[in-house]
Amino acid sequence: MYSPDTTKYLIHLNLQAEGVVEKPDVVGAIFGQTEGLLGEDLDLRDLQRTGRVGRIDVQISSKRGETKGDILISSSLDRAETAILAASLETIDRVGPCVAHVVVEGIEDIRVTKRRKIVDRAKELLLDHFEDGSIDSYELLDEVREAIRVEKIGSLGDEKIPAGPNVMDSDAIIIVEGRADVINLLKYGIKNAVAVEGTNVPAQIVDLADKKTATAFLDGDRGGELILRELLQVADIDYVAFSPRGKSVEDMARKEIIKALRNKVPVEYVRDQFYGDVPGEKRTQDLRPQKPGASEQNSIKKENVENENESTPTSFEPISEPAPPVTLHDHMERVSGHLIARFLSPEFTILNETRADDVEMAIDQMTTEVSGLVIDRVVDQKLLDRLVGKGVEFVAARDFNGIIKRPLSIRLMKIAQ
């Protein structure tokens, strides 16, 4: 018995008969006129009996004394045998009592047709039924590398504080909020981060901050400000860096992390905002990354520090040819004492510089995105309200007076005098 699943080829024949004939006449003519023509191996009846040739499908119609139509025969023979069988059918010259002509119109390779359907269907499945996300070798490598970095996260003390592998050996540490922040910094090769995991700062972090150069790297939201306030009360923090508004440290990309850490500011510039002056304590503006003799320097009077800075200028002080400012701290130093104001871009380039007394007019004329304002004058509530809605993320000023309602979207920093 013939199975349609084994069909390889489909023979298409065209029939024209000079008279009216029926389907049985056509089938009888095919079997009768091909019998014994090709030998026993290619006898059409035997081929049908063994299932190598399918049923003969005849579609004809009679009109005006003529019969026309198509004949379809499926075959599972090889190409040569199928071609011979098709050619033999063209020898049919009569159907019933009528003269007839049979012509092979084509031999269709069913497998090619199936392959074409498979390709078309595969395209549909690929576009519509696969989940989003292609396999990327770089993503696979990043996942493996991140897993290795996660395994490298250590824990300090009995409190199991999450920390990078180089926290104890490094001369400087970066204090972040949680374990996810440490993992993200590890992802980009920063191995000296340690997490406070809440506002209750562990004693071991306090001890590390006393011995090493400590940078607080926190989210720029309310939670980050509360943690910084706690750190300023219990730990010796040297520098402060914040993530961009609306983004946490754990979500920052490598370029954003490097930029934020590069633009960290000494703690003196934010101390008044988050903690206020500590009675009886004077902190120097030593910007060196090392902290030898820090306790002795804290007791030096401001006048002596200024004399020392004049004799041995640090890398931040302008010399004969001042370098262009590259950090927020540089702009603070350049503006201090000059009664000017600078509008800065997100990359800390100068968008506009004007007299400090004319800053209100400059704000009204702003046409480009401004990330921050550094100004050598006292900022009051009225000036601060003008900056709301302008996209300004921070204001560094000589002082702040009469600030009753501080905008959550603007970070305030005091320029150390």
UniProtKB/Swiss-Prot annotation:
Superkingdom field: Archaea
Any single GO CC term annotated in Swiss-Prot or TrEMBL for this entry: primosome complex
Gene Ontology process terms (BP): DNA replication, synthesis of primer
SMART domains per the UniProt record, alphabetical: TOPRIM
Keyword Cell division annotated: no
PROSITE patterns in alphabetical order: TOPRIM (PS50880)
EC number(s) per entry: 2.7.7.101
Toprim domain segment(s): 171-257
PANTHER family according to UniProt: DNA PRIMASE
Protein name: DNA primase DnaG
